[in-house]
Amino acid sequence: MVLLRLLVFLFAPVVSDLCSLPCFINVSESQGPGTVLQFLSFNCSSYTPTPTLELLNVQPPTTFFNPPSLARWQGTYVGKLTLSSSAQLDALMVNHYKVQLKFTCGNHVMEGSLSVDVQRDLSHIQCAGQFASPAGEMIQVPETVTPGARLYTLLLPGLELHGAQMSIISAQDLPHFPGPFSINEQGWLQAPSQGLLGQAQKVFQLQISVSFGQRQSCQGMVIVKVLPVPSSQVSFLEQAQNITIPENLAPGSEVVQVQARGVDLRYEILSPVPSPLFSIGRADGVVRTTTPLELARTSGTAVSRLQVKAFEQGQLWASAKLNLTMNVQLVNLWPPRCLPALLVSQIPETAPVGTVLNTLTCEDPDSVGATLDYKLWFRSSSNPASLCLYDRVLEVNATLDCDTPGACFQHAASILVLDGGQPQMTTEVPVLVMVTPINEFSPACAPRTFRVQEDAAPHTLLGSVVGTDMDYPHDNIEYYTSGGPTTFAVDRLSGEVHLLGPLDYEQQRLYRLTVLVIDHGQDQNPNHHLSGSCTITIEVEDVNDHAPECEPPFQELTIYAPLGRSVEVTKMSCQIPQEPQRLIYSYSIVGGNSQNRFILQGAILVHSDLVLGPFWPEQPRTYELLICVADAGPSTPHLSTTATIIVHLVPRRASTVATSTHRTTVPSTMTPMLVTDTEAFWQPQPWFVVVLTATGALLLLALGWLLGRLLQGLAQLLQAPSKPAQALLLNSIQGTEGSIEGFLEAPKMEMSQAPSSVMSLHFDGRAQDSRTGRDYLFNTHTGARRWL
């Protein structure tokens, strides 16, 4: 019978702890296909998708187990694990299987292992194999075998633990036998004490009886064939080997492959028999494990000594022996465990060297109290000297100043914890150190001087104030003005200085503006700001924006100039009232100086007749001179004004008195008047022009279409006139004779529609219209009329 155990696993909604899975179940080797090995009960509140139970793998690999089934019964999911159709359990071959299962309930997944131990079945023990067959088990031994040597080992699985009794029941009488063969309780068939020399080619049949339990026995036959001295030699390259293997080798794992020299060799383990931990491949000599080698659970497995025999197939006397020592080494199964599993620290960048960030506590589950090794490994490219690890304490090793180029606000590292086991196990503890910025330095800006012309337009860019801040992020500052004139403004982000209002060089030539720079975003406290200031000087450059004015602007002079002499006519007095400091002007005659009789010497107008000769006028003459007065100097642009001087020149014959000048000036109150003519014009929006153009085009198209239709109808009427149409026209004329409109339009209609047939009508009467008094002719038959 199979031992069935119902294990209930409580889930929320699935089992949350893998340790609740069963550890071991026992099954008899006599169980065959379809045998139920285990029922598993699961609670799952998820119905979509349907819960599943899967078989992930089996160690050692085998096909003896069916995929588990899962069914719902009374609100609980019951899984069932059974043996497959190929199952042939044999405790001597493999007595332990590890089945890995996986249960899925919705998004929750649980994996666990089930250990299956195969148990021997005493009722299944019997003589089997060639030994129990009618032909028996044949062995071949050389005649040189040592007297009393072990020739054969009778293996009856399971009987070694139940005191089986073995004896040879066949006759061994002389002279057919050199001496009696013997067999002990361990199943060792031994050669006669006399040896087998001289018994070559002889065959000895030995009937062996095996008794065990209460009245249980079986019989078999061993046939010993004695062979002559072998012609070949079997040997190993070395007589002994020491092999070290880890304890975590799975059953069936290869340990070592032994090789001997010889022909058609076979291998077997001579001792211990049976071998509980190892087996050897008969043909390939590969030594494998048959059971887990866990030192903590199985005593006596640390060191195992095996004796391996290599022999030729068919010539058992041609053999050699090899001693193997198996050293099972303790395996380091668990890495160190550390608390906390993640180190996260936050410190200001001004933290001093030696500040303790965190302390790590670790232990080795495989060896409590063992010494562990700690190493600090940096993940990021930040300065590795910023942090250090003293034993288990993480400290600040160097300044964490983050004002230098390169981000240093986060240090990612790992602490590697290594144990001293084999293989060496390592635990990695992630370390994340976040450095918070501190606003340490006040921003600053350098004084600047900007120059701007007084005619600069508003919003003109004068320059930029450049502020600096040593805190990271660098130069993350804002600009403000502290008092000062409102004529200028500073951009808050860029520091650009713009002109807001008009300037006048004559009123103010120098401005001083205090700019305040404030940093932001450089401290974990958003309200912690530092500030600085600097003075900006703005110099206004003069621009020539006023034309000169002459006093008086108009003069009328009469001069008497003798022949051959130059006469000073007048000296002009011009200045710019708004700029009294400007004293340099240029003067030029731009009109009225016919024959070049006048010249300017600075501001003095001079009449010169040195070059006149015979062209001296006989009669007095008047000259209207236009004098252009412009400001001079480096200021641009140069502005000018025009003064008018009327000179009445009296020739030398006109008077005999001394030369004199008569001045007539325009009073200063009579200043030129500046007339501004503003011409108003209408400039429509572009969309209005487009709409108006489209509307006009559509209107022209409509008028053209209408005109075409009228012309077409008129042409048809003129080309094909009919009498009914003419009569209708005449009747319409008669119907409107009482109205003024009919009176006015009737002649036109008669004239426009006067075909030959109408014009040739005979009018036999004449009458006068009672309303209008006009005379008309009429036809008494047709009623047609013709106005006179």
Swiss-Prot record:
Its main location: membrane. Residues 1-16 form the signal peptide. Glycans are attached at N242. It comes from Homo sapiens (Human). Cadherins are calcium-dependent cell adhesion proteins. They preferentially interact with themselves in a homophilic manner in connecting cells; cadherins may thus contribute to the sorting of heterogeneous cell types. One of its GO terms (molecular function) is calcium ion binding. It is found in: Membrane. Keywords: Calcium, Cell adhesion, Glycoprotein, Membrane, Repeat, Signal, Transmembrane, Transmembrane helix. It is a single-pass type I membrane protein. SUPFAM superfamilies: Cadherin-like (SSF49313). The lineage of its organism: Eukaryota, Metazoa, Chordata, Craniata, Vertebrata. It comes from the Eukaryota. GO terms for cellular component: plasma membrane. Residues 708-788 are cytoplasmic. InterPro entries: Cadherin-domain_protein, Cadherin-like_dom, Cadherin-like_sf, Cadherin_CS. Residues 17-686 are extracellular. The chain crosses the membrane at residues 687-707. It holds the Pfam family Cadherin. Residues 237-338, 339-449, 444-554, 551-674 form the Cadherin domain. One of its GO terms (biological process) is cell adhesion. This is Cadherin-related family member 4.
